[in-house]
């Protein structure tokens, strides 16, 4: 069934265009041709009638009525074998005079025709027509050719009837003039054959021109299809916007879709990378706890709450990053209020377990009144990455302090490590960029932290600590709390 549909409804736009246009051209050509032929035929009949009427007037002029009889005196220069034949009837339809004696033709004249002026046609077989034109050898040859092609062919003869009223010298007469040469043998009849030839030539010329027109008109679509194939083969990123006006909107919308899909893909990939990085700390805590259980430094009852807490943290992180992946640009941030001190206590407790062997000393100087306005997981993600870096690169001490204004929350993390060179203090926030390539890491944590703070119209500033190491100042904006309902 599908093959039949494809056969009758081609999928190619060029073939569709060619067939539709060819059909329109054919219909219009037939319509115009038929109108022209019908007009020509009507004009030809009128011309023939006028010529035959002229013959009728001539014979009426030559006719004389004497002793109740009609006499027609033909001059010597009028050939009795002329291409017309004249019959004259009285008002009762009785034949008064005949130019030639052709019985079969006289029988074909209908009595009703004789009552008024008119133009008529009679059908005769080839043999009868041949008898009517026995003296014309060229016509006889043409009739022979017709007879050889079709012995039963019929010839059409034109008949003009003219009624003349009675006068003082002439009674009422009806003159019938028959064109002895059939219409089929006249050169004017060839116009139908010419029409077929012209129509055929028209189609033979028009179809190639239509094909060229279709090829030229559909080139932009072919170019677009080629660009789509290049997109599929990853040889181009976007469609060329410089196209025809009709395709501009389509190309623009497709490019928007491509950009949106690419951004969404990049977002998912980035989110997956960030999730992997964020799970490092809870997994490290679990690993450290299991190591302590194995060495019997910690009992099962002590390890259980720690492990459950980290498992809960992993579950929260997965949910958090799935939520981030589904968020669209411009999504409103949460306006929840969270005390900063408890959040940092939980983070430092987890990091102490991770860096237990290193013996990191983390000190907090956080006022209980200081709060964070926003998504709790955002705060934990930012501070977790910053504190993890501080614990990783410090020698022993890490200090955390905080202050708050009406619009901003400032948290400062300092360590006594080697610090960050001045030339690297902006590079470290780029994904995949790390100052110390000897230590394990992917260079993702600080990039994630900065992206989140920028969502809060904040930033992270790297500097030099009074302890001799790095100083990271995390600034959260948009910290004005939501107005309370009165």
Curated annotation (Swiss-Prot):
Protein's recorded name: Sensor protein PhoQ
Q: What is its main location?
A: membrane
Task: Kindly list the biological process annotations in GO that this record carries.
Answer: cellular response to magnesium starvation; osmosensory signaling via phosphorelay pathway; phosphorelay signal transduction system; signal transduction
Q: Which GO terms describe its cellular component?
A: plasma membrane
Known consequence of changing residue 434 to A?
2-fold decrease in ATP affinity and 51-fold decrease in activity
Show where the HAMP domain sits: 215-266
Keyword Kinase found: yes
Q: What is the lineage of its organism?
A: Bacteria, Pseudomonadati, Pseudomonadota, Gammaproteobacteria, Enterobacterales
What does the record give as EC number?
A: 2.7.13.3, 3.1.3.-
What reaction does this catalyse? ATP + protein L-histidine = ADP + protein N-phospho-L-histidine
Record membrane topology: Multi-pass membrane protein
Q: Which InterPro entries match?
A: HAMP_dom, HATPase_C_sf, His_kinase_dom, HisK_dim/P_sf, PhoQ_Sensor, PhoQ_Sensor_sf, Sig_transdc_His_kin-like_C, TCS_sensor_his_kinase
| Binding site residues for a divalent metal cation | 151-152
């Amino acid at each position: 069934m599908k093959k039949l549909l494809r056969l009758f409804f081609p999928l190619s736009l060029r073939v569709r265009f060619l067939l539709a246009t060819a059909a329109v051209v054919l219909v219009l050509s037939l319509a115009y041709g038929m109108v022209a032929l019908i007009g020509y035929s009507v004009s030809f009949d009128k011309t023939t009638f006028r010529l035959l009427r002229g013959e009728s007037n001539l014979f009426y002029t030559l006719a004389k009525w004497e002793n109740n009889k009609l006499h027609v005196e033909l001059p010597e220069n009028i050939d009795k074998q002329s291409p017309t034949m004249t019959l004259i009837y009285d008002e009762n339809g009785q034949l008064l005079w005949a130019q030639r004696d052709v019985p079969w033709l006289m029988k074909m004249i209908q009595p009703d025709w004789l009552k008024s002026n008119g133009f008529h046609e009679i059908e005769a077989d080839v043999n009868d027509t041949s008898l009517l034109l026995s003296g014309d050898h060229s016509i006889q040859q043409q009739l022979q050719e017709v007879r050889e092609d079709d012995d039963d062919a019929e010839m059409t003869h034109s008949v003009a009837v003219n009624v003349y009223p009675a006068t003082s010298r002439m009674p009422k007469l009806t003159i019938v003039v028959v064109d002895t040469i059939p219409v089929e043998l006249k050169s004017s009849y060839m116009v139908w054959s010419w029409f077929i030839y012209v129509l055929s030539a028209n189609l033979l010329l028009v179809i190639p021109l239509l094909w060229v027109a279709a090829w030229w008109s559909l080139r932009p679509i072919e170019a677009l299809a080629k660009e789509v194939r290049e997109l599929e083969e990853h040889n181009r990123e976007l469609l060329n916007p410089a196209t025809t006006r009709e395709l501009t909107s389509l190309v623009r919308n497709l490019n928007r879709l491509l950009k949106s899909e690419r951004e969404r893909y990049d977002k998912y990939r980035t989110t997956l990378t960030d999730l992997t990085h964020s799970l490092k700390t809870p997994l490290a805590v679990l690993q450290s706890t299991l190591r302590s259980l194995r060495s019997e430094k910690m009992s099962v009852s002590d390890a259980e709450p720690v492990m459950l807490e980290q498992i809960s943290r992993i579950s929260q992180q997965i949910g958090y990053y799935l939520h981030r992946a589904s968020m669209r640009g411009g999504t409103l941030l949460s306006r929840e209020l969270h005390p900063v001190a408890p959040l940092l206590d939980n983070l430092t407790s987890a990091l102490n377990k991770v860096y237990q062997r290193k013996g990191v000393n983390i000190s907090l100087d956080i006022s209980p009144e200081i709060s964070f306005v926003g998504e709790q997981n955002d705060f934990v993600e930012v501070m977790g990455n910053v504190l993890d870096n501080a614990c990783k690169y410090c020698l022993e001490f890490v200090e955390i302090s905080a202050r708050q204004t009406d619009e901003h929350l400032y948290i400062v993390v300092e360590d006594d490590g080697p610090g960050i060179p001045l030339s690297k203090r902006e590079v470290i926030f780029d994904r995949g960029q790390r100052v110390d390539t000897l230590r394990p890491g992917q260079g993702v944590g600080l990039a994630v932290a900065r992206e989140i703070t920028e969502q809060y119209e904040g930033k992270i500033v790297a500097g030099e600590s009074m302890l001799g190491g790095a100083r990271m100042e995390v600034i959260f904006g948009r910290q004005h709390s939501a107005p309370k309902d009165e």
